[in-house]
Amino acid sequence: MGGGLMAEPNPEELVDLGVESYKAKDYIQAKKYFEKACGLNNGGGCGALGDLYDDGKSVEKNLIKAAQLYTKACELKEGVGCKRLWSLYYYGRGVEKNLIKAAQYASKACDLNNGSGCGVLGFLYGSGKGVEKNLIKAAYFYSKACDLNNGGGCGNLGVLYQKGEVVEKNLIKAAYLYSKACELKDGLGCKDLGTLYYNGKGVEKDLTKAAYLYSKACELKERLGCSALAVLYINGQGVEKNLTKADQYISKACKLGDQEACEVLKEK
């Protein structure tokens, strides 16, 4: 072929170009790439386009359109699209709230090895939402989620080991799972591991480590991490006593929705 014509980018390349455009805040160009990829039946393109309509950054927010695009993505075996549909049906955003459908989409996401989908499915079985409550199944899906590097799945499995629910109580295993959750940037996992270090359960008692983990949890926007760290600053445990810092962490906990922290602030 003469004329130096470049080959048309394939659907995967179109998605990559769209992501690059999105990162560069060129949302209009990103939308064009995603539309083209989705038109070529690329699930990732449809899912990414759905995200644009979901967050309303580059196009007018349209949850109905987002739901349609996520549905197409899911049908094209794009796990993230199925997981997004779980969220829409669970919260009733852009579609009528339907917990049974939410569970079905979480299950499909998990079948497609989407770790977040498996974690959500574990939560649904653990709470009996959209499916019959079954802690054995919850543990199974948390375990699969954790194997797929979903921090929430590791953390929730850790809780079952700490409590001895449907698995034999094992605090060392719980500590390991919280540690993995924390490494995967799950704030609650960091907080729960911090509490084990604070109490010396499953690990050797270490208040400095507890403070570090509560701090990490707080950075990851886990309100209970912020309030736990505030208590350490008040008591001078694992950190130097500092009431100003304690107040800052109580304030952050309140902003993140910790009602007890808000009550403490009101009393000041």
Where are these regions (language model features)?
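Terminal, low-structured helical/coil segments at or just beyond the last alpha-helical repeat
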Residues: 11, 252-268
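Short helix-capping/linker turns of helical repeat alpha-solenoids
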Residues: 9-10, 21-22, 39-43, 55-57, ...
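Hydrophobic face of amphipathic alpha-helices that form TPR/SEL1-like repeat modules
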Residues: 14-21, 48-55, 84-91, 120-127, ...
